């Protein structure tokens, strides 16, 4: 009997779950699923470090509030940490079914219930877009001037998703759409007018028409700042920018962001 009792009370061997810590996203810890993309996710904390820290400041100070659109969500390296830092919904939008499945599975493992994946490409209207790239990480613009790539996907606008009640109450839009930024904003007029969200967007300053998208934001009464941060693994001219609606913006906010991250990186355009 004593041997039986002894065997029943032995501690079980616990297999530790691999994890990623996003130190620059308020130290969010994510358990990783058994998938090749999990290693990419684990490394993302050290990419776009200043951008991540700026977003953390904006979330902690409730400048980013309500729901978030993460467009070009890829493997959820922004969507998932943000979902753990806000009470609202993160709409993770990406054209790749594999990326959306990876995000969903990672969220399930971590009991994250406020991420909604939407498998679409986004542009200024409803149409078929094509790419020569794998959908997992692609551009519908670069290297495809005639829209005749072998991979085809359904594209819609953010205004279409809003009208169809797929998205609502938007406080922040993040765009990483490889050359489609202008068209995405062009197709978001109703969303912008209804919610006046903060917008971040990535551009290649030497090959994208940065002045064109600046003019579009100014037309909507936004103030744009470039984040002067070199992005590892990207072209040397790749930069993120932040567009603040004029009613949200003030000089003190910019000073507070610089104080929080410890350096001056925001350049008004």
Placement of each model-derived feature along the sequence:
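Short internal loop-to-helix segment that lines adenine-nucleotide cofactor pockets
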Residues: 39-69, 116, 142-195, 206-207, ...
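Active-site flanking residues adjacent to catalytic metal/cofactor-binding acidic residues
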Residues: 69-71, 93, 120, 173-175, ...
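Internal alpha/beta domain cores that form substrate/cofactor-binding pockets in large enzymes
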Residues: 158-163, 168-201, 206-261
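S-adenosyl-L-methionine
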Residues: 1-162, 165-167, ...
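Short, glycine/acidic-enriched loop or turn micro-motifs at the edges of active sites
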Residues: 73-75, 97, 122-124, 177-179, ...
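Hydrophobic packing residues within well-ordered alpha-helices of enzyme cores
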Residues: 82, 103, 131, 184-188, ...
């Amino acid at each position: 009997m004593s041997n039986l009792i002894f065997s029943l009370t032995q501690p079980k061997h616990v297999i530790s779950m691999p994890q990623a810590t996003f130190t620059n996203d308020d130290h969010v810890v994510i358990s990783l699923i058994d998938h090749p993309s999990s290693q990419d996710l684990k490394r993302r904390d050290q990419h776009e470090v200043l951008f991540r820290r700026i977003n953390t400041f904006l979330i902690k100070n409730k400048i980013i509030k309500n729901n978030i659109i993460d467009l070009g969500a890829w493997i959820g390296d922004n969507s998932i940490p943000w979902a753990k830092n806000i009470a609202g919904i993160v709409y993770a939008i990406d054209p790749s079914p594999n990326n959306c499945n990876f995000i969903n599975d990672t969220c399930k493992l971590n009991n994250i219930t406020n991420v909604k994946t939407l498998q679409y490409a986004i542009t200024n209207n409803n149409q078929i877009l094509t790419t020569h790239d794998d959908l997992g990480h692609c551009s519908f613009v670069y290297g495809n001037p005639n829209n005749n790539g072998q991979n085809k996907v359904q594209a819609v606008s953010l205004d279409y998703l809003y009208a169809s009640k797929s998205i609502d109450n938007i406080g922040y839009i993040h765009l990483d759409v490889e050359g489609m930024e202008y068209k995405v904003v062009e197709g978001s007029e109703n969303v912008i007018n209804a919610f006046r969200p903060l917008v971040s967007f990535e551009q290649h300053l030497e090959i994208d028409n940065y002045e064109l998208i600046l003019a579009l934001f100014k037309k909507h009464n936004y103030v744009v700042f470039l984040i002067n941060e070199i992005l590892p693994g990207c072209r040397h001219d790749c930069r993120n920018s932040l567009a603040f609606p004029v009613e949200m913006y003030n000089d003190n906010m910019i000073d507070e962001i610089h104080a929080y991250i410890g350096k001056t990186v925001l350049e008004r355009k």
